[in-house]
Structure formats: structure tokens, C-alpha cells
Amino acid sequence: MNLIDGKQIAAKVKGEVATEVRALAARGVQTGLTVVRVGDDPASAIYVRGKRKDCEEVGITSVEHHLPVTTTQAELLALIARLNADPAVHGILVQLPLPKHVDERAVLDAISPAKDADGFHPFNVGALSIGIAGVPRPCTPAGVMRMLDEARVDPKGKRALVVGRSNIVGKPMAMMLLERHATVTIAHSRTADLAGEVGRADILVAAIGKAELVKGAWVKEGAVVIDVGMNRLADGKLVGDVEFAAAAARASAITPVPGGVGPMTRAMLLVNTVELAKRVAR
């Protein structure tokens, strides 16, 4: 069984990004990512600190706009409009969740597609769905594809199962696998025979957000297992959406939790940001 080490691959990606950032700086372009955070959600604060640290490591200028929880939707949209117009800002990321009085979809849609560091704008998602290259892609599925490449797993002709249908991971993940000529199935909470679907999959991507929902005994012998899930149990232990030990005994390759997909999601945010900066520099 091959353990697909997300930390190791993310470090490689960061090295590549740092080289790109230096090349842009030599041409007078200082790559910049702006993060907008509303309120004082503790988890959001931790995530933003991590993103700032990642940016520092590769030479990207990171700016945070931390707004009070009372910020109105109009005020937030006005800030995004200013950032869209600022040539020093190459990527914009709005940290979720937003307060309940703010329309999350309206805010994300207000980000210019040309500055959409998360790859969530409908224009960019639509471009992905019809195979247009050169647009930012959602970070987690993009990170999964890079992990498959690094593990020398070619999706072409293989049965791929994506467990989860979110707009952030599941749906774009399925599109990226389809783009690479996999035969793709999407399963979800209402799938009638999840065990049967898992048992047929050569590549399994679990992204449903339920601790150890996918039993290791279901996994096809020799399958590649990518576990996007990150769930904290009552005892504080972090586990994925797949029973790791039992699945690892059957899989040819598997990602750990933690230390698997998580570091790659953050690394691909840096990739998106530098790619957006390169478009401006052309």
C-alpha cells in the first residue's frame, strides 16, 4: 500500500509557486492575495492565519480585511468592488462561513472571475464544465488531481466514484475526473447501495463530511482511495470519511487524515493566485 503524502506533495507545489512568484517579481509584478473575513469565528481565524503563513513561505503578499460581524451586505459588496478594481490584488478570497444576514452566493458572485482565487465563481465553474483551460479551479479537487498525478495514477478508463455532491468538492471533482477520461459516478446521502458503488470503484474520492461513513471492507482490492473528509470525534481524534486502517489493507494507495488532502487544498490556493497574477502580467 502506498501512502499518498499530502504534506510532501504540497511542499513540492509550494516550491514551484515560489519560483513563479520570483519570476513575476523580476518583471515588476508582486503577486498579491487578499482575504476578506467577517466576524470572529475561531476556525475561520485559524484558517486565515494558515493561509497567510503559506503566502509568506512562497513570497505572495497577503492582506486581510477583517470586518465586524455587523458588516452589512452592501458594505461587503462595496469592499469587493474596490478589490476588483485594485491592480495590486490578483486573488480575492472570502472566508466562509459568512454571518447569516449576508447572502453568501451574492458575495461570492461579486468577485471578479479574473480574481477568483477559490475557483467558485459561476463563470469559472461553467468554464470547467465545458473544458475551457486557464481559469482558476476549486482548490480541493485540483489538489486531488495533482495527488493522483504525483502517485502516477492515470484516471483514463478507470471507474471513479465521488462520494459527495457539494459545489465546492463533489461536483467539480467529478468534472475533473471526467476531463481525464475516467468513467465517473457520483454517490451521496440518498444513494441506494453505497457499498456496492464503492466496491466497483478503481478510484474512490470520499467527500461527504461524515466520519468513517465509507467502510474499509467495501473498498475494492487495489483501489486508490482519496479521503477529503476531516471530522473530529468526541475524543478529539481527527478522522476522514473512510475507515482508514481497514481501507488501507485493501487499497493500492490511500491518503491519510490529517496530512492528506488538506495541505494540498491550501497549496492549490497559492497556485490559483500566482496563475491569476501571470494573466495580468502577460
UniProtKB/Swiss-Prot annotation:
- How is this protein annotated for GO cellular component? cytosol
Q: Where does NADP(+) bind?
A: 164-166, 189
**CDD domains reported for this sequence:** NAD_bind_m-THF_DH_Cyclohyd (cd01080)
GO BP annotation list: L-histidine biosynthetic process; methionine biosynthetic process; purine nucleotide biosynthetic process; tetrahydrofolate interconversion
The record ties this protein, via InterPro entries, to:
Aminoacid_DH-like_N_sf, NAD(P)-bd_dom_sf, THF_DH/CycHdrlase, THF_DH/CycHdrlase_cat_dom, THF_DH/CycHdrlase_CS, THF_DH/CycHdrlase_NAD-bd_dom
Instruction: Write the Enzyme Commission number(s) for this entry.
Output: 1.5.1.5, 3.5.4.9
Q: Mind listing the UniProt keywords for this protein, alphabetically?
A: Amino-acid biosynthesis, Histidine biosynthesis, Hydrolase, Methionine biosynthesis, Multifunctional enzyme, NADP, One-carbon metabolism, Oxidoreductase, Purine biosynthesis
Keyword Amino-acid biosynthesis found = yes
Q: Which domain of life is it from?
A: Bacteria
Q: Which pathway does the record list? A: One-carbon metabolism; tetrahydrofolate interconversion
Is-annotated flag, keyword Hydrolase? yes
Molecular-function annotations in GO: methenyltetrahydrofolate cyclohydrolase activity; methylenetetrahydrofolate dehydrogenase (NADP+) activity
Q: Which reaction does it catalyse?
A: (6R)-5,10-methylene-5,6,7,8-tetrahydrofolate + NADP(+) = (6R)-5,10-methenyltetrahydrofolate + NADPH; (6R)-5,10-methenyltetrahydrofolate + H2O = (6R)-10-formyltetrahydrofolate + H(+)
State its role: Catalyzes the oxidation of 5,10-methylenetetrahydrofolate to 5,10-methenyltetrahydrofolate and then the hydrolysis of 5,10-methenyltetrahydrofolate to 10-formyltetrahydrofolate.
Q: How does it assemble?
A: Homodimer.
The Swiss-Prot or TrEMBL record describes its family as follows: Belongs to the tetrahydrofolate dehydrogenase/cyclohydrolase family.
What is the name attached to this protein's record?
Bifunctional protein FolD
Origin organism is: Anaeromyxobacter dehalogenans (strain 2CP-C)
Q: Which gene encodes it?
A: folD
